[in-house]
Amino acid sequence: MQSLPEHIALGMGIAFHAKNIPDKNAVISEYGTRTFQELNANSNCYANFLLANDLVPGDSVAIICKNRPEFLEALFGPLRVGMRITPINWHLTPEEICYIVENCEAKVVVCDAIFSDFFEEIKEKLPEVILMAADGENSLALPFMETIQKYDDSDISDPVAGRSMLYTSGTTGRPKGVFRKENPPPSKTEQLTLDTAAFNPEEDFSICPGPAYHAAPLGLNINPSLMAGVGVYLMDKWDAEKMLSLISEYECTHTHMVATMFHRILRLPEETRSKYNLSSMRWILHGAAPCPVEVKQAMIDWMGPIVYEYYAATEGGGCFIQPEEWLKKPGSVGKANEGTEVKILDEDFKEVDPGKEGTIYFSAPSKGRFEYYKAEEKTSGAYWGDYFTMGDIGYCDSDGYHFLTGRSADTIISGGTNIYPQEIDNVLLMHDQVAEVCCIGVPNEEWGEEIKAVINLEEGADEEEVLKELLDLAEESLSGFKKPKSYEFWEEDLPRLPTGKIQRNLVKKRFW
């Protein structure tokens, strides 16, 4: 089999494999299967549809789809004609979805037909946006496959590399688009992913248990596999035993997971785990959230030293650690990647000594630096000179290995998803009997953290009545993963700084 030329644009890598291995399955899912030839042809059709509808390089399109082949066709098409693509988290509320569609300036949105609320919200507030239903029918949208297949499916004669703009939640709860004016060179994390994965297209097959809209499953699981000519199974809804069953059935060799998945699989009875032949699996990459040492150790004890870990974010940065290293440095996320400098700084932006905690800063690349789209203040707040931070706290030991001791003071990480509590605070404060509220992450054995709301009530308020009303309020106003799992009412005042800001870290200390 021919090797893929180096540095070929992501959108065109599929075209290369469509010529060399046209009938090989590129994607298998509960929603359908695509060979490399089919995936490539449909991507071309969509690209030509966009051009025919007067979109030009630099224009924005969005995807709101589950893990299905159409997601990838809606991704690769725009990336071959110089457009900007934004996959959106379909767990968000219609209002949040519409905000991102408007903020990223999407001209076309491909969305699963089952999300009727999204179609209605977008059509009402952004009537000029072209809506397409990825599957089935919706009266407000064009049928995706039926529509694009009217257009030319041959390869684009003069492809232009597009780029993606993914969204990460802001500390105020509003999502932030991670924008780059130019594509950066391949990151060292991506290169280490390929090097350690060591794909063999003639034998390997990947499985993606995470949502394709998320930067990590897309960028470190799906894309590397397809670019290497390796097919991938897209799981629709993750289930521990189902994943083991699929690994056994398809003889999967590569995957990307988060710590919550490790925990759930390890929690399965031994007789359940032993039913499945997992001997084909030889590479598991994980990240997105800290993994307890005992959980990762248990995974390595069970699966062998095939568990690799990275530390990076949508914004960039990067550390990487191989299993043999991790066994010598349990809990570490690795050394800084080649070409990346890491500084641990105190509150005065002074470097701290090895072993001492501080905020983690990464050196920014000279090409393709990120900025938060239409948010200059948030962009400047993330940078310190030529360095940027995701707000994470950690330390570096004397050997240069980095350890995370917590995310930014406010961030809650539940099941690998970042949740910013200010948005939840603001919703609960809508209740007229809530005087003050502070949402925090508290330990959860399965998810890492879960959301707890700590509340000061107005004098004379009835706790039971208010609790019932708060549950209703959260149900109406918050996405499922943002709803508090528990509520606690305090008689004492919540701790505050002289500026009036609640000291969330002091509240959190009560529960850790």
Describe the function of each predicted region.
Residues 52-53, 80-147, 157, 457-459:
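Structural core segment of the AMP-binding/adenylate-forming
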Residues 71, 92, 109, 245, ...:
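AMP-binding/adenylate-forming catalytic core of the ANL superfamily
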Residues 23, 149-169, 173-174, 198-205:
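Conserved pre-ATP/AMP-binding loop-to-beta segment of ANL
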Residues 35-37, 163-189:
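Conserved AMP-binding A3 loop
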Residues 6, 25-68, 72, 76, ...:
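Conserved AMP-binding/adenylate-forming core of the ANL superfamily
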Residues 183-209, 213-254, 268:
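Conserved AMP-binding/adenylation subdomain of ANL enzymes
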Residues 166, 227, 252-257, 268-329, ...:
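Gly/Ser/Thr-rich phosphate-binding loop
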Residues 350-381, 417-419:
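Conserved ATP/PPi-binding loop(s) of AMP-dependent carboxylate-activating enzymes
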